[in-house]
């Protein structure tokens, strides 16, 4: 490809090629979509996956038997009247169907029952017990297997084996990711 110089620039320059492309640009694209005609053959099956339905989608929420306990910690207000704890901030969720029995009514409350709160905080262990968050063993299992309860300098508690194994892979606390090493934790004697 030879290029000849002109006063206006090279004949086969990129700018000249761009100008010719723009001059012979594609025709305007039509704004309306044209339907494609499908030709059915004897052996082919056509499956419509567009899911265009004229009826609205209805989700039935009346038959959900699952219960979710949400623990919202609120500070008590001064001079606030003390309400009974059972149903103070609760509402009844029931079906609009009169035919269904009333024993299916569910109380929804912002307060968590004391026994559910204790189980939710530390698994199935009551509060005040020590367990390793990695292997989930309690104090008695840890001691029976010859391990120690250890605490990092950031205050997190583990069994000695789990923390040692964790520090082999990463020199950080498994809970808060603060940099620690094998010299930065100590046993706790209970």
Swiss-Prot record:
Q: Which InterPro entries match?
A: RING-HC_RNF4, RNF4, Znf_RING, Znf_RING/FYVE/PHD, Znf_RING_CS
Pfam families tied to this protein = zf-RING_2
Q: Where is this region: Mediates interaction with TRPS1?
A: 4-61
Tissue localization of expression is: Widely expressed at low levels in many tissues; highly expressed in testis.
Q: Does the keyword Phosphoprotein apply?
A: yes
Q: Where are the zinc fingers (RING-type)?
A: 132-177
The secretion signal range is: none
UniProt GO MF annotations: DNA binding; identical protein binding; nucleosome binding; SUMO polymer binding; ubiquitin protein ligase activity; ubiquitin-protein transferase activity; zinc ion binding
- Binding-site residues, Zn(2+) 1: 132, 135, 159, 162
Q: Which catalysed reactions does the entry list for this protein?
A: S-ubiquitinyl-[E2 ubiquitin-conjugating enzyme]-L-cysteine + [acceptor protein]-L-lysine = [E2 ubiquitin-conjugating enzyme]-L-cysteine + N(6)-ubiquitinyl-[acceptor protein]-L-lysine
**Residues given in the record as Zn(2+) 2 binding sites:** 154, 156, 173, 176
Required for ubiquitination activity: annotated span: 1-16
Position of sequence motif SUMO interaction motif 2: 46-49
Q: Which UniProt keywords apply?
A: Activator, Cytoplasm, DNA-binding, Metal-binding, Nucleus, Phosphoprotein, Transcription, Transcription regulation, Transferase, Ubl conjugation, Ubl conjugation pathway, Zinc, Zinc-finger
Which SUPFAM superfamilies does this entry report, sorted A to Z? RING/U-box
User: Region (Disordered) spans which residues?
Assistant: 1-29
Q: At which residues is Phosphoserine found? A: 94-95
Query: What does the UniProt record say this protein does?
Result: E3 ubiquitin-protein ligase which binds polysumoylated chains covalently attached to proteins and mediates 'Lys-6'-, 'Lys-11'-, 'Lys-48'- and 'Lys-63'-linked polyubiquitination of those substrates and their subsequent targeting to the proteasome for degradation. Regulates the degradation of several proteins including PML and the transcriptional activator PEA3. Involved in chromosome alignment and spindle assembly, it regulates the kinetochore CENPH-CENPI-CENPK complex by targeting polysumoylated CENPI to proteasomal degradation.
Kindly state the subunit structure of this protein.
Homodimer (via RING-type zinc finger domain). Interacts with GSC2. Interacts with AR/the androgen receptor and TBP. Interacts with TCF20. Interacts with PATZ1. Interacts with TRPS1; negatively regulates TRPS1 transcriptional repressor activity. Interacts with PML (isoform PML-1, isoform PML-2, isoform PML-3, isoform PML-4, isoform PML-5 and isoform PML-6). Interacts with PRDM1/Blimp-1.
Name-wise, this protein is: E3 ubiquitin-protein ligase RNF4
The organism named in the record is Homo sapiens
Q: What is the lineage of its organism?
A: Eukaryota, Metazoa, Chordata, Craniata, Vertebrata
């Amino acid at each position: 490809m030879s290029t000849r110089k002109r006063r206006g620039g090279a004949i086969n320059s990129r700018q000249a090629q761009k100008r010719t492309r723009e001059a012979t640009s594609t025709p305007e694209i039509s704004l309306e979509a044209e339907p494609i005609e499908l030709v059915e053959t004897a052996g082919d099956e056509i499956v419509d996956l567009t899911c265009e339905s004229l009826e609205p989608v209805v989700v039935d929420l009346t038959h959900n038997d699952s219960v979710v306990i949400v623990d919202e910690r609120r500070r008590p207000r001064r001079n606030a009247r003390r309400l009974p704890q059972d149903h103070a901030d609760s509402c009844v969720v029931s079906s609009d169907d009169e035919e269904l029995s009333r024993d299916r009514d569910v109380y929804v409350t912002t307060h968590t029952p004391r026994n559910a709160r204790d189980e939710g905080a530390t698994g199935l262990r009551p509060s005040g017990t020590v367990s390793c968050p990695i292997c989930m063993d309690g104090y008695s299992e840890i001691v029976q297997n010859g391990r120690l309860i250890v605490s990092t300098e950031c205050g997190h508690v583990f069994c000695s084996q789990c923390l040692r194994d964790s520090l082999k892979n990463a020199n950080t606390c498994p809970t808060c990711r603060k940099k620690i090493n094998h010299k930065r934790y100590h046993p706790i004697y209970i």
